[in-house]
Amino acid sequence: MKRFIYILGLLILSLTSFSDALVQKNISLDIAQNLASEVLKEAKKEKVNISLVILDKGGNVVLSMKEDNAAVHTMKTAQKKAFTALSFGITTTEFASRVERVPNLTQIENTTTLGGGIPIKAGNETIGSIGIGGAPSGAIDEKIGNAALSRISNLLK
């Protein structure tokens, strides 16, 4: 009987540890919608038509949208920006600096050095990313994304 209780205790402890390991922060559709709304407000202030892609921690598209007058290439560009930011956990602007030191990084499929890709973080943990394309420069795309992220920062805790 003691052996049974001992084994049962170990089983319960291991299940508790296992369930804790499965709990991960991730970007939800609700957060993605709030972020997209803020991005569109910022894009309107900048008088640019953009496309945006928001990825979750696993690289799945949570939300993508293209404004009516955004150029045709902006959706694919936004996707690459989001993928790059998620893959490396840094902005695409920072990735461009890294590529200067390690040019072979450009061989990684679906990455880009164009500004406008930003990791979405909860504390120090990357829980997703956003890619924005359509402004005359990647710096403006990134400015739009950072402003929007700062306005929803309370949702990322």
List where the protein language model places each region.
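Bacterial N-terminal signal peptides
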Residues: 5-16
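Flexible, solvent-exposed loop/hinge segments and secondary-structure transition points
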Residues: 19-157
